[in-house]
Swiss-Prot record:
Gene (UniProt): Ola1
The species this protein was found in: Mus musculus (Mouse)
Function: Hydrolyzes ATP, and can also hydrolyze GTP with lower efficiency. Has lower affinity for GTP.
Protein name: Obg-like ATPase 1
Keyword DNA damage: no
Transmembrane parts of this sequence: none
């Protein structure tokens, strides 16, 4: 079957943020809400987790493998010499405090660390513990969430003024017509962020030109958020906490579409200290499970990332791409020659491969597709690329 011609792909929505696939998600919250403990269990590292504010000053960064039953199945099937999963880059950022945008606490340094990330795990505390002090004096996750939102919002407002002043000087008073469109776009951003007090990401109709300007400045409120609610072990196991419904209602109202994921740092820490057999027995006895796989997958998806597989006896590998990536660019993740000489992508859906039992069976069932350069790669595709090898220049 020849590869499909143009028009076999749907134009994806524009994505706000840095281009590329080596994106980072930062753990953000007030001091002493459990950020470093969460980072430790997530990355299996031992970043300092002491009970005092600003314990983490330089952000700790780690790569976390993305759990995926599809990847595990392909490894079991092929028994490859090399196994390379997808990874999520996670950064533990020191606690923000009220007034951070004005330099309170270690404010501006922390905000710059957030700016260097592409998404946010917004971690809030919903457990009581007299041994762990709260910087605001009491446990109130709604108040804490609002403090973080306000600090990010105020920092963006602070950024917009100088950008507009510079553009006005050059584009309006200086008559530089090339910069006039950017000035007009920044006026729209100012209206949305400063006048209407709304985060950049809440406006869903930014056009391509506006996205280009937003990507130039990387405003803090443009970054996607996943809300993580740190519960006591008891509350997490019984699936009850007085704050959870209130947090979900707040997020649905003020950050619609964002995920809220409850977890227990204390439970995750305990599970990590048990052997695999003891861990399984404990989870079964308490009819619960770790929240970490769900959190990792949610962070990966929030960054608009996905992956396709190459699979065989030599290697099973997950190749990370941005959502909406076309086949030639996906091929280029493996090697630039694959993109330059792209002919076609031979694609199997993971579900078809698992159901049919082999590549030959997928072909026999008519489910093995040859796709052209307009094909938009889908998450979990198993792909074999065909390409022309670039010719070497002839020696004279």
């Amino acid at each position: 079957m020849p590869p499909k011609k143009g028009g076999d792909g749907i134009k994806p929505p524009p994505i706000i943020g840095r281009f590329g696939t080596s994106l980072k998600i930062g753990i953000v919250g007030l001091p002493n809400v459990g950020k470093s403990t969460f980072f430790n269990v997530l990355t299996n590292s031992q970043a300092s987790a002491e009970n005092f504010p600003f314990c983490t000053i330089d952000p700790n960064e780690s790569r976390v493998p993305v759990p995926d039953e599809r990847f595990d199945f392909l490894c079991q099937y092929h028994k490859p010499a090399s196994k390379i999963p997808a990874f999520l880059n996670v950064v533990d950022i020191a606690g923000l405090v009220k007034g951070a945008h004005n330099g309170q606490g270690l404010g501006n340094a922390f905000l710059s660390h957030i700016s260097a990330c592409d998404g946010i795990f917004h971690l809030t505390r919903a457990f009581e513990d007299d041994d762990i002090t709260h910087v605001e004096g009491s446990v109130d996750p709604i108040r804490d969430i609002e403090i973080i939102h306000e600090e990010l919002q105020l920092k963006d407002e602070e950024m917009i003024g100088p950008i507009l002043d510079k553009l006005e000087k050059v584009a309006v008073r200086g008559g530089d017509k090339k910069l006039k469109p950017e000035y007009d776009i920044m006026c729209k951003v100012k209206s949305w962020v400063i006048d209407q007090k709304k985060p950049v990401r809440f406006y869903h109709d930014w056009n391509d030109k506006e996205i280009e300007v937003l990507n130039k400045h990387l405003f803090l409120t443009s970054k996607p958020m996943v809300y993580l609610v740190n519960l006591s072990e008891k509350d997490y196991i019984r699936k009850k906490n007085k704050w959870l419904i209130k947090i979900k209602e707040w997020v649905d109202k003020y950050d619609p579409g964002a995920l809220v994921i409850p977890f227990s740092g204390a439970l995750e820490l305990k599970l990590q200290e048990l052997s695999a057999e003891e861990r399984q027995k404990y989870l079964e006895a308490n009819m619960t499970q770790s929240a970490l796989p769900k959190i990792i997958k949610a962070g990966f998806a929030a960054l608009q990332l996905e992956y396709f597989f190459t699979a065989g006896p030599d290697e099973v590998r997950a190749w990370t791409i941005r959502k909406g990536t076309k086949a030639p660019q996906a091929a280029g993740k493996i090697h630039t020659d694959f993109e330059k000489g792209f002919i076609m992508a031979e694609v199997m859906k993971y579900e078809d491969f698992k159901d049919e039992g082999s590549e030959n069976a997928v072909k026999a069932a008519g489910k093995y597709r040859q796709q052209g350069r307009n094909y938009i790669v889908e998450d979990g595709d198993i792909i074999f690329f065909k390409f022309n090898t670039p010719q070497q220049p002839k020696k004279k």
